[in-house]
Each structure stands twice: as structure tokens, then as C-alpha cells.
């Protein structure tokens, strides 16, 4: 079961969602992205999406945090398929039938995250996240193909939420934890247990990073105007 917690972090109003549903669990695209629609209706201007991912790039270490600079959608579906819903847009220029994804992940928020990470004493690399539908882990041959495509990370979430957030005009910062080395790159078979173990290993570092980040994000992202809040 997931949880929703609303409160203040560094004096900044935040909504934190713990847990998400996935397409591989049998949920529809609308259900997978519904939390983002709710957050958009609440008037949020930026979202930090976190995920666990398999590391494809050479040099990645289990437990490493990586900022998403771009993504490749190989899930086989797009959450915007169907009638366009411009009423969900919460910023001028958003809600388009064909939203631009040139900067799916905010360059300004990535720079802010790198600065916050440096202040915490570690480097935050950028990566390209490739999304598949799951639930089976990828094969070594697929990982070799994904590397040719330019992917440095692979996972089963995040991309649908990013697409919907950008459709609504919400700025996105994506942070991935390298939970394992992708298939064929490590010495052992992949398991969900190692994903959980990596998450526990990085949770404190991620919490400290977010504490530094939130005030900076609030200062960077302008609040919604009364006109924009009107339905």
C-alpha cells in the first residue's frame, strides 16, 4: 500500500507519495499516471520522480544516484493515447495534443541537483533511462541493444509519469538509484531482493539531497497565478 504525506520541508509546502502502481501489475495507463494528474490539480509546479534502475553504463556502481537527462520509451504505450485533455494543463502552453519532449527533464533542476549533491560530498552523474513494461528483467541481448541505443539505465516506471507531468506543464527532476547491474553485466542473477537492498542503502543520502533541493526548487519554480489556477 502507498502513502500520501503533505507537509513542510524547509518551510516549503510539499506532497510526498510513497509507492506507485505499475503497468505490469495490470493497471491501466490512466491509473498509473493518476497520481500526477492529482498533483497537477493541486497546483504543483515541479515534481521529483525517484526510481530504482538497472545500470547499463560502464562505471556505474550499485547504490549510485543518477539524474535523468533524457529517456527512451520502449514500454509499448503512451499515457496520452486517447482524447486530449487540455483541462489538465496548469501552465500556459501546456495541454497540447503533441507536447514537446525536448527537455523532458528540467535542465535547471538537474543543475540544482548537481549543486546540492556536491554540497553533500558526492558527484551526481546524468543518464538516459530506458523504460520497458516488465515484469521480467531484461535479457543480456536486450541490454546490449539498449546500450547501442544510448541508454545508461533501464527500468519499468517513471517515463509515463514524466510524459503526463510535461503534458500538464510540470517541471520534472528524475533521480534513479542504480539498484543492480543490468543483465549480463554482473556476476549473479537479478532479483527483486537486491533492488530493495540497494534502495535501503541509498535512502539516507537521497533524503539529505532532497532536504537541500526543495528550497532551491521552490525558489526556481514560480508559483501558479490565480488565472492559471482557474479551471
Question: Where are the regions a protein language model picked out?
Answer:
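Metabolite-binding pocket within alpha/beta catalytic cores that recognizes anionic/polar moieties
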Residues: 1-101
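Polyanion-binding loop/helix "lid" in catalytic or ligand-binding cores
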Residues: 92-106, 131-133, 143, 199-213, ...
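His/Asp/Glu-rich mid-to-C-terminal helical/loop segments that flank catalytic regions of hydrolases
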Residues: 183-231
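General beta-strand structural signal in soluble alpha/beta enzymes
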Residues: 16-18, 47-51, 67, 124-130, ...
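Zn-dependent metallopeptidase/amidohydrolase metal-coordination segment
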Residues: 156-194
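Non-catalytic positions within long, well-ordered alpha-helices that form the structural scaffold/packing
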Residues: 40-43, 147, 166
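Active-site rim beta-loop-alpha module in soluble metabolic enzymes
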Residues: 100-147
Amino acid at each position: 500500500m502507498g502513502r500520501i504525506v503533505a507537509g513542510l520541508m524547509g518551510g516549503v509546502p510539499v506532497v510526498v507519495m510513497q509507492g506507485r502502481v505499475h503497468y505490469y501489475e495490470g493497471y491501466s495507463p490512466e491509473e498509473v499516471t493518476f497520481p500526477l494528474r492529482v498533483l497537477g490539480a493541486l497546483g504543483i509546479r515541479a515534481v521529483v520522480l525517484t526510481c530504482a534502475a538497472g545500470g547499463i553504463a560502464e562505471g556505474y556502481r550499485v547504490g549510485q544516484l543518477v539524474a535523468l537527462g533524457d529517456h527512451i520509451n520502449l514500454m509499448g504505450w503512451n499515457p496520452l493515447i486517447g482524447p486530449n485533455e487540455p483541462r489538465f494543463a496548469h501552465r500556459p502552453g501546456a495541454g497540447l495534443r503533441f507536447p514537446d519532449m525536448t527537455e523532458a527533464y528540467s535542465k535547471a533542476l538537474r543543475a540544482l541537483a548537481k549543486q546540492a549533491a556536491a554540497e553533500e560530498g558526492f558527484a551526481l552523474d546524468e543518464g538516459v533511462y530506458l523504460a520497458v513494461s516488465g515484469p521480467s528483467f531484461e535479457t543480456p541481448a536486450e541490454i546490449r541493444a539498449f546500450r547501442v541505443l544510448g541508454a545508461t539505465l533501464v527500468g519499468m516506471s517513471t517515463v509515463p509519469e514524466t510524459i503526463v507531468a510535461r503534458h500538464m506543464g510540470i517541471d520534472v527532476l528524475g533521480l534513479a538509484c542504480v539498484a543492480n547491474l543490468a543483465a549480463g553485466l554482473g556476476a549473479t542473477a537479478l532479483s527483486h531482493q537486491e533492488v530493495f537492498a540497494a534502495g535501503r542503502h541509498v535512502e539516507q543520502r537521497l533524503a539529505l539531497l532532497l532536504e537541500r533541493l526543495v528550497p532551491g526548487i521552490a525558489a526556481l519554480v514560480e508559483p501558479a497565478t490565480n488565472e492559471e489556477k482557474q479551471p
